[in-house]
A protein has these predicted regions:
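Membrane-interface transmembrane helices that cradle and orient dolichyl/undecaprenyl
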Residues: 112-115, 154-170, 276-284
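Short acidic/glycine- and proline-prone juxtamembrane loop motifs at membrane-interface regions
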Residues: 133, 139-147
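Transmembrane-lumen/periplasm boundary regions of multi-pass, lipid-linked membrane glycan transferases
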Residues: 179, 190-289, 303, 356-362, ...
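Signature aromatic-anchored transmembrane alpha helix within multi-pass, membrane-resident enzymes
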Residues: 330-371
Length: 525
């Protein structure tokens, strides 16, 4: 009989694992959550919208059970934010910030479930708070801001069950997993790794519970609408992943993939999460939770073998940080090293604070450029666009409003009789999203584009007799239009290279109606 099964039969022992100081630490965890909120809010309006945020807002105007490149939840969050809180950067970014703050608090709670005291809880939560990648992904509306919350909630529920809570809690696991699938399909990777981890760690007996299978059915039912949408649309996510690996993502070796984990989480936090992994495998106390260690290794292997982006495993690390907090607490307690109990957290905090500007835009651009020149290793690239002056995360926050202004100038110079029939065709969803967000105040119509879900939404009712096109190669335009005139150029010194020196064309005399040539503008990536 496994150790976890024994614990399930002995709730008193499971309760005894929770230290008496657990309640006393709650105000300190709350303080860390407040610190997380303060840091994120400090940079909420410093730069502009991130490229994907503009796209998600456009998706929120076309609510559906699926999109070419994502499940429906992120579009729904965008719609809710704008309708409940207003059409501002603050409203769009509030929910991801709250999700990130919840992950900080939940990490401390998971450390408690692992049997950790004050030090374990605070150390794990602090590590999650200060990890540069967590700060970055929680700074803007993104599926990546919510994914750690879904993974961590599932882990917390599972650990509670292992510690003796009612197996009925598996139903909550199913709900969380189902919602996670509607956020990002990589929840499937977590689910597979979690199940395999239970089997490899000797906890496969948990599958004998009817509740875990009911939970699986709940998750499937919640996922089913998006699954049906995918099937009806020819599984576009498969095409997106295949094209991104071939044309967009940086190709890196497994060694570089692993090295990026260290940078994303901060090198000073490496001993903590590695210690957490070791605690799961090598200690008596961690044996009950070995399934989480196996699941992490499987997640890592799957993403490396699938040539995924190196940040894909990041949602898993709060679990290892919580376990690492317990391992560190046990180490300093067993060896009576109080100085280490102070020194390591202090060094970690100092190092983490030093890298906050790489995750949250708290500094003006000029100041950040000077500051970051001394720490170039933290400017990690995940896409194959040439390097620009700013890290990719920040570069994609510049140029959008200016782009809309330039297009507006061009649009309003079109003769009035022709203007009402003139379409605005953007080369990618960021450009189209910028027109859709800033355009109403500038008197612009909604944009069209062949990129991802914009392609699915079609050319609206435009004939193509007059089209303002930017972000598409000139040779493609001359192939389909008899008259192609460059009338402006869009650029921004801090934007991504792909948004530098973008020509703006007015195209007329199409060879065929726009609906006919529309498939040639398709770009699924």
């Amino acid at each position: 009989m496994s150790a976890a099964k024994v614990l399930l039969q002995n709730n008193a022992f499971a309760s005894a694992l929770r230290p008496e100081s657990a309640r006393a630490v709650t105000p300190l965890l709350a303080a860390l959550v407040a610190a997380k909120l303060a840091i994120q809010f400090a940079g909420i309006n410093q730069y502009g919208f991130f490229r994907d945020e503009l796209y998600y807002m456009a998706c929120g105007e076309h609510l559906a059970w699926g999109y070419i490149d994502q499940p429906p939840l992120i579009a729904l969050v965008s719609w809710l934010a704008r309708h409940l809180l207003g059409n501002s950067m603050f409203s769009i970014r509030l929910f991801p910030i709250l999700a990130g703050a919840t992950v900080v608090g939940l990490t401390g709670m998971l450390a408690w479930e692992f049997g950790g005291g004050k030090l374990a809880q605070l150390l794990g939560a602090t590590a999650v708070l200060l990890a540069p990648a967590n700060l970055a992904f929680d700074s803007f509306l993104s599926m990546n801001a919510f994914e750690p919350l879904f993974w961590l909630l599932c882990a917390w529920i599972a650990v509670r069950i292992v510690n003796g809570a009612s197996p009925v809690l598996w139903l909550a696991f199913g709900v969380v997993a189902g919602l996670g699938l509607e956020n990002k399909h990589s929840m499937l990777v977590f689910g597979f790794a979690f199940a395999a981890g239970l089997i490899l760690s000797g906890e496969g007996w948990l599958f004998k519970s009817k509740w875990i299978w009911i939970a699986a059915m709940i998750a499937l039912l919640l996922f089913l609408p998006n699954l049906i949408w995918e099937a009806r649309h020819g599984w576009p996510q498969v095409e997106v992943v295949r094209n991104a690996q071939r044309l967009k993502n940086v190709s890196i070796s497994p060694l570089r993939f692993l090295f990026d984990q260290v940078l994303f989480l901060h090198p000073l936090e490496l001993p903590l999460w590695l210690g957490g992994l070791a605690w799961c495998f090598l200690t008596v106390q961690g044996k009950r939770f070995r399934f989480l260690g196996w699941a992490y290794l499987i997640v890592l292997f799957l993403f490396i073998s699938m040539h995924g982006k190196s940040y894909y495993p990041l949602p898993y690390y709060p679990m290892l940080m919580a376990a690492g907090g317990v391992a560190f607490e046990r180490l300093v307690s067993a060896r009576n090293r109080r100085s280490l109990a102070v020194a390591f957290p202090l060094i970690m905090v100092i190092g983490g604070v030093a890298t906050i500007p790489f995750g949250v835009p708290v500094l003006p651009v000029a100041t950040f450029l000077r500051y970051s020149s001394g720490l170039p290793m933290f400017q990690v690239r995940v896409e194959s666009d040439p390097k620009v002056s700013l890290p990719q995360l920040y570069a994609d926050m510049f140029g959008w409003k200016n782009m809309a202004n330039v297009v507006s100038d061009v649009y309003h110079k079109i003769p009035a009789g022709e203007r009402s029939r003139c379409a605005i065709l953007a080369g990618n969803y960021g450009e189209a999203g910028a027109i859709d967000y800033y355009g109403p105040k500038l008197g612009l119509p909604k944009a069209i584009s062949g990129h991802n879900s914009y392609f699915d939404w079609g050319p609206r009712n435009y004939t193509g007799e007059c089209v303002i096109i930017f972000g598409d190669p000139t040779e493609q335009l001359t192939k389909f239009f008899g008259e192609v005139e460059q009338v402006a150029t869009i650029s921004n010194p801090h934007a991504m290279d792909v948004e530098q020196n973008v020509p703006v064309f007015v195209c007329r005399k199409p060879d065929a109606p726009l609906a006919t040539i529309w498939p040639h503008f398709k770009m699924i990536i």
